[in-house]
């Protein structure tokens, strides 16, 4: 069943809102409304996949979402906890309870009050607990944590069975919960302090409580005048030992701890970060850096093991991750190992065999002295040690690897036929899982765009598929690096928590439910709004990351769809404006959140179009400043919505830096430093040169033959482009090549040499004076030819992100053009990811100040 179908069913719960908002009462939500007559399905969405693209098969989840005023199977014997604003129920918890065990009891009482207008008493002193348990045959009693385990010791057996079913031999921990109703008693317990809270969260979620984002803004607490527990005997344990996220870039942590427990995250970690240099600094060769130490030599293992021995003997968890960079060793032993394979992603030799030799040697030395130690050594599988080793290596038992595939497609799932990089990542992952014998944690990036622009960046479309691979491989779990920034990440963390706890959960059901509970009367247009975004991310052929791909996702067609849906949503919520009840205020606030997010998105894309497509830098600066102002409003609304305030945004990689770049380009065309002579064409001819024969065959002088291209039916997809077999085709200068469908037959981004060509008519007046050709955005090493003559060469670091983030190239072309028709040819070499132009070039004449 699709999200749209599920949503249509759930819309039946919204009739009171959709037929007349006057029925909204204080603290009521959409969940209270009686059935509606019908609901419209989502409208057609812009941004459909390029013609000829394969479609990924969706793995359907098997566990439906069941919520309501009765937790468990309802019947005549339901245990009523609260009704009509009254309750006699008691929550029992030990006085000596742990932090989250105690918080679980307090939150349970608090949320029951918010759901049913009646707050149970909390008994925690020994005398109060004893009295509550003595009266539990006549009074509804909810017993939390160790108190439940003491009152019903058979719960321990249930927890153990659930734990064994999830993982027979856990390495770090197991998180299990048990919820059982016996007569007037409801037992809620877990296998540890966190799990006691998970048990309470399980119960609350059965009543319909949700925590979509940290803090009060992100929670949905339904209203039930009668709250009960039916027949209920449930025990469960997550198959993943590590279910953690942390906030990088100084993201705002407000509400994080509660959000984590309510969505079943834990804080389990084996330290793995960049710290190797502190143990190898004495081994740095003269005149070299920490990246030049010998790696696989015995002396390195001896040196490091000696420093770790005390911690290892004490059974500690030891951090031993590579430094954040590219290693280059001159050791003869290392050179022999790194010669085994080349890493095409990092454009250097793979150091995995050398590092795994080092890690195993170090671990073996420590184990030889302390064979019974329970110590663990964490390290990163990252940078140029991402590829599995060539040699047949099994990791020594103390080693725990954190697999951090930072430079792989972050958009698609591992089985998606549209992404060769992700399918390669899948195979790499499974190989590492075998090498590590399951002692593997995914170092998960969310959002995966890294340097981004506060635009929606959903990632559940990939994670929901990948988590099934993690389950199959039996790894330890997932450790997510997020920056919070909820306007960007949205439901990503919520869905991660739910999937890591229960991999079979119905993701589509959770998303559909979110619309009704979060947006109330605006649920229908908001479903269409967000489903449009999700669909484009799901179906895009783009596999790259960072803000350059935004125009490939957020097309004018998609923006028009979103604008219309947002207008519809605002119209539906208009009657709620100014109302004082909490529910109305929440719905209005959430729609304002979406509206400000759209203002950020719309203005950023207007800026991009003005600069990249129209060469209108004044308009680009104005749109960029409007977008940044909208972002300020979004941040003022809630500091968890963005992160830029705390990290600072210095340099051209960031949005203010991009606006600054356009401010610096503006004088070149407005007469202060230069006069615009001509915008080069937006559409260029382009040709693959896989065998690098173009120079030898004088492609820079040959006439352009577009016969094959012109014969193709439109629209043209990647398969049709590939079928041209290297003949001339056409591309746009305002978007990098891969996002236009310039791919290999397996949907791998095209790498290698390519040729751009265009003609431009210039008058004698236009070619006079100090003429300069400006490429405001172009990747790769390039060679420029004008009228068959090579006039400039542009060097470029192979890995694109190691270059100046302006990605500009300016060439003095005075005297190179003639009056009349001129040919401009660019030869470029793309070894990695992004290829070609992404901002339209222009000719300008320099003006003397």
Per-range role (PLM):
Residues 340-359, 395-415, 499-507:
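Acidic, His- and aromatic-enriched active-site or binding-groove loops in soluble protein domains
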Residues 292-302, 310, 420-522, 528:
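Structured mid-domain segments that build the active-site/substrate or prosthetic-cofactor binding neighborhood
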Residues 96, 104-107, 111, 158-360, ...:
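Feature activates predominantly on carbohydrate-active enzymes
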Residues 667-776, 794-809, 823-826, 830-849:
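Extended carbohydrate-recognition surfaces in non-catalytic/accessory domains of CAZymes
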Residues 30-36, 52-178, 227-233:
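Acidic, contiguous N-terminal accessory segments
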Residues 474, 498-683:
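Catalytic domains of carbohydrate-active enzymes that cleave complex glycans
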Residues 785-791:
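Short strand-turn-strand beta-turns centered on an Asx-Gly dipeptide
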